[in-house]
C-alpha cells in the first residue's frame, strides 16, 4: 500500500480485501495494513485536506477529478518529483515506483534497445559477464541473470512494443526517426517492461490509437502489481481498473468499480445528501 503523510488527524486501516476501516487509536488488527489521513501542502496550496490515499497492493485504481484538482501533482508527490511543504510520502518497503519519462527517447537507439536498457540491472550484468574472469563471480552473474529471467527479456520487450503498434522492423529503427507521439510509446513500453510494484500513469492513451489503447487495457487488467492511473478515457476506466479514487477540493473518496459505477454511486450519494439538508 502507499500513503501520504503530513499532519495526522485520523488512522485508517485496510483489511485483507482492501476495505477501509476506521480506528482512532491503537495498533491495527493482525493482517491489516495501516495508512494515515493527513493534510498535504505543495507550494502553499492545499492538495489534500485531511484526506486518505491508500491503494492496497495489486489493485488497479483510476484517479479522477476536475482539471486543476491536483491529480498530476499527487502523482508527482508519490514519485518524489515534488516535495510537500508540510508532510511526506510513505511507500511500501522496497516497492519500486515507475512512471513514464517526460523526455521522449531519441537518437540512434532503437525502440527495442531503449526498452531493454531500461532494466539497468540486466544491462549491467550482461556487460560484466563479457569481462569477468573470476569463476565465482561469473557463476554469480549467470545465476542472477537466470533469477531475473534475463534471457526472455528481448522477447518480452518485443511483445510490449508490438502491442503498442511497433512491427518487427520498426522496433529496430532509430528512435530519432519517429514522431514525438511514437517516441512516447517507447517510453511507455519501457516502464511497462520494468513492471514496477507501483505503476503510475498520467493520461497514457493521449498518444495511442484505438488498437494501442485496447492492448493497454488488456495489459493493465493482468498487470501483477499496483496501478494508479489518471485518465479521461471513460472506456479505459471502465475496463482496466477496479476502483476509482476521486479527488475533489482536497478530499479523496475511493469508489469500488469502474467509472460508470463511480458516477452512479456519486450521484446517488449527492441525492441523499441533498435530501438530508
What are these regions (language model features)?
Residues 1-46, 50:
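P-loop NTP-binding core
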Residues 45-274:
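ABC ATP-binding cassette signature C-motif
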Amino acid at each position: 500500500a502507499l500513503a501520504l503523510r503530513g499532519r495526522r488527524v485520523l488512522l485508517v486501516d485496510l483489511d485483507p480485501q482492501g476495505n477501509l476501516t476506521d480506528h482512532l487509536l491503537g495498533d491495527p488488527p493482525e493482517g491489516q495494513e495501516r495508512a494515515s489521513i493527513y493534510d498535504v501542502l505543495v507550494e502553499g496550496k492545499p492538495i489534500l485536506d485531511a484526506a486518505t490515499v491508500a491503494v492496497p497492493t495489486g489493485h488497479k485504481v483510476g484517479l479522477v477529478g476536475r482539471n486543476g484538482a491536483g491529480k498530476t501533482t499527487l502523482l508527482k508527490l508519490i514519485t518524489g518529483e515534488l516535495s510537500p511543504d508540510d508532510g511526506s510520502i510513505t511507500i511500501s518497503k522496497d516497492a519500486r515506483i515507475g512512471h513514464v519519462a517526460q523526455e521522449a527517447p531519441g537518437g540512434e537507439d532503437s525502440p527495442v534497445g531503449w526498452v531493454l536498457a531500461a532494466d539497468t540491472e540486466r544491462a549491467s550484468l550482461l556487460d560484466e559477464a563479457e569481462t569477468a574472469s573470476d569463476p565465482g563471480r561469473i557463476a554469480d552473474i549467470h545465476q542472477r541473470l537466470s533469477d531475473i529471467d534475463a534471457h526472455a527479456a528481448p522477447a518480452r520487450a518485443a511483445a510490449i512494443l508490438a502491442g503498442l503498434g511497433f512491427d518487427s522492423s520498426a522496433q529496430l529503427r532509430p528512435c530519432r526517426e519517429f514522431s514525438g507521439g511514437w517516441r512516447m510509446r517507447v517510453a511507455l513500453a519501457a516502464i511497462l517492461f520494468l513492471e514496477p510494484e507501483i505503476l503510475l500513469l498520467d493520461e497514457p492513451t493521449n498518444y495511442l490509437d484505438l488498437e494501442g489503447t485496447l492492448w493497454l487495457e488488456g495489459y493493465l487488467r493482468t498487470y501483477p502489481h499496483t496501478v494508479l492511473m489518471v485518465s479521461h478515457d471513460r472506456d479505459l476506466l471502465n475496463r482496466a481498473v477496479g476502483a476509482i479514487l476521486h479527488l475533489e477540493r482536497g478530499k479523496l473518496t475511493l469508489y469500488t468499480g469502474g467509472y460508470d459505477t463511480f458516477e452512479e454511486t456519486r450521484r446517488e450519494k449527492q441525492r441523499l445528501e441533498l435530501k438530508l439538508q
